[in-house]
Amino acid sequence: MINFNKFYKLFNLISVFLVITSIILLMFKGLNFGVDFKGGTLIELRLNDKQTTISSLRKSFINMNLGDVNIKKFGSNNDFLIKFEKKDNSSDSIELIKNDLTKSIGNNFTFRRVENVGPKVSSELLKSSVIAIILSLAIMLFYIWIRFEWQFSLGAILALFHDVVLTLGFFSLFNLEINLSIVAAVLTIVGYSMNDTVVIFDRVRENLRKYSDIKIYELTNISINETLSRTIITSVTTLLALLSINIFGGEILKGFSLAMILGVVFGTYSSIYIANSVLINLNVSQKTVLKEDNN
């Protein structure tokens, strides 16, 4: 049996350091928000042939120095939605873009729609994204508060906070773009981390009812080992799928898959070393669980 709790204090100190560092980065360096949140110009483009790839199209727009460029397929395989930071949809500016694009890929495209994404729409989108993340956290925490004792709930809260803050801190450190797909990834991370934590907590509570003579330090270690095969299988299979998306999914999915990879790694780690450490430090015992059962 692996003794996961042998170095739990050391891992706790490392986590505290990383969380504080991430918070400092988020406060003073901030996040690199993409066009979705900063506003810019939106172009709906249709290619008239199948030879031009999305990578060559992206390269052409990046070379125009338009700021952050986001290109996505929608509808048919020849339709693309292009967003970039430069806020100028005047006829002269659009004509220059058309000329540059013609030089790069030829005259085989049509601009079906051109419009500005204003700062008001972007700020509302950012506000909605923040509300979505906060609501998802609140619902998850409400669920675990009902299902488990308050000590377990506190452990889950700290584990979730740890995972989300470290993921955002990583994006801040390396100045990676934050767009709507990253928001979706963060929401998924919340669910994944909570699921991992609940599986171990469920086994801890079950073992607390069965063994009255085993201290919580040993009991959490037993519970982690009993659920280890499930944790490894779930984490490894999820990571393999995400790595495939990151390598072969193209530029559009790189940010999303990277955020998810970080979330899976942090979520697996926190369910073992953060959530369970709270139970150890609060010295949860069989009396705690039985008292709650009687209530």
Predicted regions: what they are:
Residues 1-295:
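A structural signal for conserved, well-ordered secondary-structure elements
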